[in-house]
Amino acid sequence: MEQSSFIKINPADSVVVCLRPMKKGETIEVDGKTITLLQDTPAGHKVLINDAAEGTDILKYGYPIGHAKTGLKAGEWVNENNLKTNLAGTLEYTYNPVNEQLNIAKENRTFMGYVRKNGEVGVRNEVWVVPTVGCVNGVAEKLVELLKKETGCEGIDAIHAWHHNFGCSQLSGDHENTRKVLRDICLHPNAGAVLVLSLGCENNQPDDFMKMLGDYDHDRIKLLVTQKVEGDELEEGMKILRNLYAQAKEDKREEVPVSKLRVGLKCGGSDGFSGITANPLVGEFSDWLVAQGGTSILTEVPEMFGAETILMNRCENKELFEKTVHLINDFKEYFLSHGEPVGENPSPGNKAGGISTLEDKALGCTQKCGRAPVSGVLQYGDRLETTGLNLLSAPGNDLVAATALASAGCQLVLFTTGRGTPFGTFVPTMKISTNSNLAKNKPNWIDFNAGALVEGVEMKDLVSKFIDKIIAVASGEEARNEYNGYREISIFKNGVTL
C-alpha cells in the first residue's frame, strides 16, 4: 500500500498535514484541486489548501486553530510565523450536550492485579517510603538503599522513596496540595506497604497528616517521626520496613476484570503527528476501557484551551458542565493573575514538530480521551470516585500532570510523545510514539509505536495490539521507564515559599 504524502484530517479543514518532508514546487491533489507547495515543508507541518485573507480563521480537525496574520496563498507552509492564536481571557459558555452512542462491545478481558484489603486493585506490589517533608529525603533514600541491599526486592516489584522539596515553608493552597498528593501516594493500590517518614517539626505535622489518610490499613502503612527516635533513625526505620516488606511479599497477583483499570492520559513533546496517530489511538483505547466499565482521566487543563467546548458538551449533565467551565476559567485566571497570556503554550519542540498555536495543540491533545461522555470532574489532589471518563485539574507540565494522574488513583499513565521523553512518575508511565522514527531511534524510551497508522496499518488492528500491550504491563511487564529506573514525583506549587 503506497503511503500518502499528506492527510486532510477533517473535510472542513483549510490545511493538510504533510506525512513526509515536501519540497517547494511539489504538487498535491486535494478535493479535486492541484496545489503547488510554495515552500519546503517539514513532515508534520501544515500546508494551506485555500487562499486566506488576513484575519481568516484557519481550520484543522474541523475547528479554528487561529487566524492568518497576513494574506496567505494556497500552498503556503502554515506555521507560528503566519498563524496567530484566537485565545484571550475567560469566556462564558453555553451547555449544548452531545450524546454520542459509541456501541463498543463489552469483552471479558482480565489482567493479573493485586487486590487490596479495601477492594482497590494495584498493578504493582511495591514498598514505598513517603517523606512528609523534604528535610528527610536523605534518610528515606538511605532506608531504601539498605532494604534493597538486604532483600534484593525478592517477592515484590520494587522499593522506592518518593522524595520532594515540600512539606514545610508553604501556606494555604500549596500546603494543602502537598498534603493531598502525599496522602494519595500513601493510599495508592500499587503500594503493598508504606512507611510515612516525618522529621517532626514540619508544617505538615505527622499526626494531622495520618488523620488525612482516613480508614487506612494500619498493618500496611506505618509512621516514623525521626526527631522522636532516641539514637539511630535508620535502625528504627529498618525494623519497621522489615515488617512491612514481610507482609507485602506475601501478596500475589490474581485475575481481575479490566473494569478495575484506571488509566491516566497524558502527552508531552507533541508534534504534528500527535493528533493523527498516538492521541487518536489512546482515545480509541480510552473509549474501549470506559465501555468495559473502566476509568480514564484527562488532565493538562491549559492544553484544553481552544478545545474546551468539545469537552463541555460531552458532560453527562449540567452540573458537570459547570464544573468543567470552572476548571477551564480558573486556570485561565491563574495565567492572567501572573500577567501571562493564556495562548502562549506551544514549546519550541512543539513548533519544530508542526504545532503552531495552543488551539492546534489542544485539538490534538484532547483526541486522547476519545468520544466517551465526561462522567466526573476532579480538583487537583482529589481521588477518583466515578468510573468512566474524568477530567482533572492540573497544569500541562509533564511530571506535575503525570504525578497528579497517578495521585488521583491511576495505576498507570499512557503518555504520547512525538519528540520523545524518558521520564516516569510513581506508576508505570508507558510512552507511545507518534512516529516510527522516534520508536526506531529511542527503543529504550518507547513502549508502543503509533506511527504505523500513517504507514498502512488499520486503527482497529493497532488498537487490538495496544490493548494487549496495556494488559501485559498491568499484569507485570515492565514499562520502559521502570526498566530504566526513571521514576519520580512533582507537586504543583503556585504560592510563596517562606
Located regions from the model:
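Metallocofactor- and cofactor-centric catalytic cores in central/energy metabolism, strongly enriched
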Residues: 2-412, 419-422, 427-498
